[in-house]
Amino acid sequence: METLTAISRWLAKQHVVTWCVQQEGELWCANAFYLFDAQKVAFYILTEEKTRHAQMSGPQAAVAGTVNGQPKTVALIRGVQFKGEIRRLEGEESDLARQAYNRRFPVARMLSAPVWEIRLDEIKFTDNTLGFGKKMIWLRNSGTEQA
């Protein structure tokens, strides 16, 4: 669990995710503030259904994306690449996620956009602060962790 712990700790300090979806051969990416749930290994985001990325996602879709900082030197590069699934939350599941999201981002209380979950199935964390090109990999279904 050391790999997932290190990844989760870093993700908890960030706040913007980029994710990409595809539909019928067309790709589209979007950015949003996120809340990371370390227990579920998932991001929670708000986005309107009328957006291009939400329309392409439908109620559920495959997704890939990144979270990264903006360091000015290569030695400080840290970032996550991931793949998983995005889905729109409904009912109590949505309500609970929205409450947690609003605690992290109080301004979101004024938004009515639906809550979406990005469930991560594979994560690659690059952390050059541990040595140039240092990578850690986590896979949900196999429980595999690679350093």
Curated annotation (Swiss-Prot):
Entries under Gene3D superfamilies matching the protein: Electron Transport, Fmn-binding Protein, Chain A (2.30.110.10)
Encoding gene per record: yhbP
Similarity field: Belongs to the UPF0306 family.
HAMAP family: UPF0306 (MF_00764)
Species: Escherichia coli O81 (strain ED1a)
InterPro entries: Split_barrel_FMN-bd, UPF0306
Protein's name in the database: UPF0306 protein YhbP
